[in-house]
């Protein structure tokens, strides 16, 4: 018996943080991802491959990938995600990300990273990634491994504080990249082993948060309701 909503033909990443991040981003409108395959970003690669709504562009060289994403963003003025592995790979993004910052292009840079306890331990492909692009992005975010947040969440919509936190970061990153003066953001994701776990892909509803501009007109129906309430108010 197949669980309702499960697609037995498509394997999704077994990493819950990746699933939440990608589900929120696609629900908000992300439709194009430029990826540079590696080892540490395997959970992201599996997750992207499972989502048919995403246009995938695979470019092994990170510098070339970043400029390709920049070009797409310049033409479409829509958000484009960049995904790379850990280590020095993210610094190959820097020239294009700097250009995106000054051209006001909403690039969403997603970098895979080792868990923080492995940094500065002479482990291969590791460096201090959180904040590495701070001077050329609107904001940076760092998401700990799945096992880093296990406490229950006070919000009844979420099973754990981890799920709520990743949802919040995904929404905030997308909003920051696309609102006001658009620009790049950096989301660093820490992954521990194993990296290649999978689970059946399920389409699901996720919480999305959007900013309403201060000068946005109120819907006519709401204006009428407010007027009626004010007219009936006793002073």
Identify what each model region corresponds to.
Residues 3-235:
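N-terminal alpha/beta PP-like core and its mobile active-site loop of ThDP/TPP-dependent enzymes
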